[in-house]
Amino acid sequence: MVTSSPFKTIKSDEIFAAAQKLMPGGVSSPVRAFKSVGGQPIVFDRVKDAYAWDVDGNRYIDYVGTWGPAICGHAHPEVIEALKVAMEKGTSFGAPCALENVLAEMVIDAVPSIEMVRFVNSGTEACMAVLRLMRAYTGRDKIIKFEGCYHGHADMFLVKAGSGVATLGLPDSPGVPKSTTANTLTAPYNDLEAVKALFAENPGEIAGVILEPIVGNSGFIVPDAGFLEGLREITLEHDALLVFDEVMTGFRIAYGGVQEKFGVTPDLTTLGKIIGGGLPVGAYGGKREIMQLVAPAGPMYQAGTLSGNPLAMTAGIKTLELLRQPATYEYLDQITKRLSDGLLAIAQETGHAACGGQVSGMFGFFFTEGPVHNYEDAKKSDLQKFSRFHRGMLEQGIYLAPSQFEAGFTSLAHTEEDIDATLAAARTVMSAL
């Protein structure tokens, strides 16, 4: 156990109570409120390496990693030092910055699909822009997204997936007009036949297909054998674009993302998280002929006050430099496999149905027999059991994503001893569930 003993959250509770009077739900992003797992959220005070400390002094082994960016560990000294130097020159220019060229070259060299790139300030912004670009390039309005794949909170992506009504493009949030999502078609993840049917029903109208090539926002779901290849074939057949949302998986699954790992090259890619080294960032890129449509080179407008700011560029450059060191992804795969395999083995030994897996430094598991191929399968997980497991692990000093439907992340800062401690905690908690 790595928390203070006994486990107390008095200060966290006080701060969150005050926050609820100041911000909707007391948070700046919904999942942080612990609504999915119950109880009060933990308020962090600081993070370092693979650990987080809350305001009550409890220390946690962190498997959220600020939702993915902290692949080198929190507050890596080389990133911090680079930021200190950059800040002396100013926090934002609102003008061209030489650091943009450096990070752009690194991204282009790494990601197979990207010949040109545009930096923005978040993954949501990147996906908003890439959707506009898909439509501008093809002259078509409709897109296909997959049930359970998250592409940010922009109106056109907020479509409830998985039912016949949802396929008609009805909005999944108040305030989103039906007309906004009318051209957003949905299909179950890992279902090529459903994708073929949508193209057949909408001949010459679909601009393209966008997806998380490995799903991290319905829990952790990998593509079936041939699924990504099948999407590439279908989109080429219909002169439509294939877009990989690699905001979460880019530079995490491999240096070149899922597209490098699985050998399937899309037309466009969105990025975020890791390429900002923990600072707000996003990017989209792809074939030169498509990207030349983006203003000011072309007529498709997109802009941003803080886009390409020197701090995000600096943190991103240093993070990618660290990731290029030898054996980086081999180590991530090694420790994450040991963690994932261990969790599943402990679940089986303690009598709990569970399934899951990992790829590189990304993992997840469900309290269900499985296998899980899509969001409908994921929803079979025992959410009450997960809530109890989450709370138990929290009290044992292990910080997991406060939702069954979020992937977990390891970092280069996690040690074999951290994995040992995590598995020991899991055995204690699962034995008592």
UniProtKB/Swiss-Prot annotation:
Pathway: Porphyrin-containing compound metabolism; protoporphyrin-IX biosynthesis; 5-aminolevulinate from L-glutamyl-tRNA(Glu): step 2/2; Porphyrin-containing compound metabolism; chlorophyll biosynthesis. GO terms for molecular function: glutamate-1-semialdehyde 2,1-aminomutase activity; pyridoxal phosphate binding; transaminase activity. Its cofactor is pyridoxal 5'-phosphate. InterPro entries: 4pyrrol_synth_GluAld_NH2Trfase (IPR004639), Aminotrans_3 (IPR005814), Aminotrans_3_PPA_site (IPR049704), PyrdxlP-dep_Trfase (IPR015424), PyrdxlP-dep_Trfase_major (IPR015421), PyrdxlP-dep_Trfase_small (IPR015422). Keywords: Chlorophyll biosynthesis, Cytoplasm, Isomerase, Porphyrin biosynthesis, Pyridoxal phosphate. The keyword Endoplasmic reticulum does not apply. This is Glutamate-1-semialdehyde 2,1-aminomutase. It comes from Synechococcus sp. (strain ATCC 27144 / PCC 6301 / SAUG 1402/1) (Anacystis nidulans). The lineage of its organism: Bacteria, Bacillati, Cyanobacteriota, Cyanophyceae, Synechococcales.
